[in-house]
Amino acid sequence: DLAVLRIGENVLFRGLGDCKFERANEAWKFDGGDGWTVAFSATWEQGRDWPTLAIGNFMDRETIIMDYGDCDASWLFRHNPGTGYQNPMALQPGHCTNSMLFSDWNRDGFADLRVSNDQEFYRRGSEQLFSLGPRGAVPMQAEDGWRTVNIWGMGIASNDITGDGYPDYYLTNMAANRFEVLAEGATGPSYEDRAGDFNI
């Protein structure tokens, strides 16, 4: 299957084999929206037969003047029997998203959603981590251990580079890229930039 992100309606295509696809928005009850979509991530959540999808939008197209505008909300789609991907949940606040990644950062068996944002365009924004639960997606705060980071966020990559059993994150940035490692002794999602220590 294939997800196509666009300025305008996003489209899901069902794979038919032999490099053939058919449009599936209507069959899967997926609202492709009309935003400026630049980011996508998908994961399998426990107890669900269909993948959970995150759609990341950049600026609200209706507010853009001279290349600047308000940051748009992004969306979390969970599939439910009978209703498909109807009734997506807003990921708010939106901070002009450029990249998303589902990741089980604390190895508890549940993926949360990291979001990398572009500080060139947001006001009072930052990088984000949304905790996923039955109520939707809740942004992590300082009281959860999440640290405020402001970058011209572009992309996110993840792997366990340090060998401690937890995923590390490489955040690309128009300035200095960040290599984020879970802080020693952290009980929440508290990360330190260790790019200098690893010469990257």
Regions found by a protein language model. Give the residues of each.
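Acidic, glycine/proline-rich Ca2+-coordinating loop motifs
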Residues: D1-I200
